[in-house]
Amino acid sequence: MLDGIGFEPRAVRVVSGGTATTVQDWPGRQRLWAVGVPPSGPMDDLSFRLGNRLVGNPEGTAGLEVVHTGPTLTFTSPARICLTGADFGATLDGAAVSRGVAVDVEAGQTLSLGRASGGGIRGYILIAGGLDIAPYLGSRSTFELGQFGGHAARRLLAGDTLHLGDGAMEPALPAAALPRLTNEWTLRVLYGPHGAPDFFTADDIDEIVAAEWQVHYNSNRTGVRLVGPKPRWARADGGEAGLHPSNIHDNPYAIGAVDFTGDMPVILGPDGPSLGGFVCPVTIAKAELWKVGQVKPGDKLRFHPIGFQQAQSLEQAQLGSLEAMAAISAVTTSGPIIQGSGVRKATHSAAAPSASRPDTPSVHSLSGVDMSGQGCGHGKECASPAPRPAAAAPG
């Protein structure tokens, strides 16, 4: 009698893991920076948080970060997902899947992500309810270098099984306008922490900011290396700290600090070191860090200096838009969100369908947030002050 009874867990089975698919959550591990534990978490936190909002997850819900080439996943039970970040040409049982909108997946369906195309290199798969993974040091984020967190403390491999969580969920939200990903970026930066003219003169800093930099192939979650003109230094060496002028006595680093390791700048990432002995003349504004998660080898970027108040306003605008999304009243509606053969419908929340295309969910834009990758440092997004820190400070 029991022979005919089968059990299928609420899970996702990994058919192939892709290049580097890991479990991450936001804001990652906090208050451990002083003992050398980085926060980890999604490199493009804006896309990650946006996806969680769209499927109705609270902040802190774990999802998947996909890099360069994506995984193939089979769902053993119904689920609701949202894809954000770079375009990986995702398909569900062969039908194209839109990004930036909640999608219902049926039991037995297979989600396949290919290679990232266009701008950006990281994508995110957010699942309603999250993933049933035990936190480590307060977070489910994977820290591969430290070999802890996430699923088995590593990137996903074929044969893995991820159990779905039972996290509290709100109704799904309308489709959102995703940040535009490009191959040419402008990153708004704050002057410092090492702004003393002993390291770089004002003219030296002007040259660094005016230069066009190219993303080096040896870039990852630890840091993004940049190739560009050799910097001029205000001194011949580092004195008692070292032979090169970039050498200083060990000091704490900030995530997003532009760290000159010799003559090569490195933008420190969420898996980077918490301290070191190199000069950091500028730091990426916290609201701009999502762009660092999307730059890929060969991309070009420039730095644009802004002030502390302006950086605060940028962060507050970003936070306010995400909070506004969470406060939208849920109105259940349906619309096809998978294009191609075998179109399926997913339940999502929207104020009203598009007038021009009644089958298209309405789009919610992150008002006041630089979604272009080309920050000019002026305009609507800089209008309102905020009491929050501007640069990513040690957690």
Where are these regions (language model features)?
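Conserved "landmark" site that anchors the functional core of diverse proteins
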Residues: 1-357, 361-395
